[in-house]
């Protein structure tokens, strides 16, 4: 038996399939047809030199205000840099070779 305190399903939950069908019937533009990953990648990547010279602590120095959490000791800097992963192998990061796939109705079925 159901509990009387259980929340009944919302209108959107009850009409999920109809909403999905309406979405695909509207034929939305979900992604550009041609994407050049090498061209887009440069706009948000940091050069290797900048990555090696700035520790995570240095990036945020001066933004912590007057509280004690705003001042890190050099010991925490050493610890943070020692756990930084500089390899892309097995980390799930993209090397630019992955193909973007547009969301289509056939992928959901």
Curated annotation (Swiss-Prot):
One of its GO terms (cellular component) is nucleus. Phosphorylated with a circadian rhythmicity, probably by the double-time protein (dbt). Phosphorylation could be implicated in the stability of per monomer and in the formation of heterodimer per-tim. Keywords: Biological rhythms, Cytoplasm, Nucleus, Phosphoprotein, Repeat. Its main location: nucleus. Residues 57-109 are annotated as: Disordered. It is found in: Nucleus; Cytoplasm, Perinuclear region. The keyword Iron does not apply. It comes from the Eukaryota. Residues 69-98 have a biased composition (Low complexity). Residues 99-109 have a biased composition (Polar residues). GO terms for biological process: rhythmic process. Essential for biological clock functions. Determines the period length of circadian and ultradian rhythms; an increase in PER dosage leads to shortened circadian rhythms and a decrease leads to lengthened circadian rhythms. Essential for the circadian rhythmicity of locomotor activity, eclosion behavior, and for the rhythmic component of the male courtship song that originates in the thoracic nervous system. The biological cycle depends on the rhythmic formation and nuclear localization of the TIM-PER complex. Light induces the degradation of TIM, which promotes elimination of PER. Forms a heterodimer with timeless (TIM); the complex then translocates into the nucleus. This is Period circadian protein. It comes from Rhagoletis completa. The lineage of its organism: Eukaryota, Metazoa, Ecdysozoa, Arthropoda, Hexapoda.
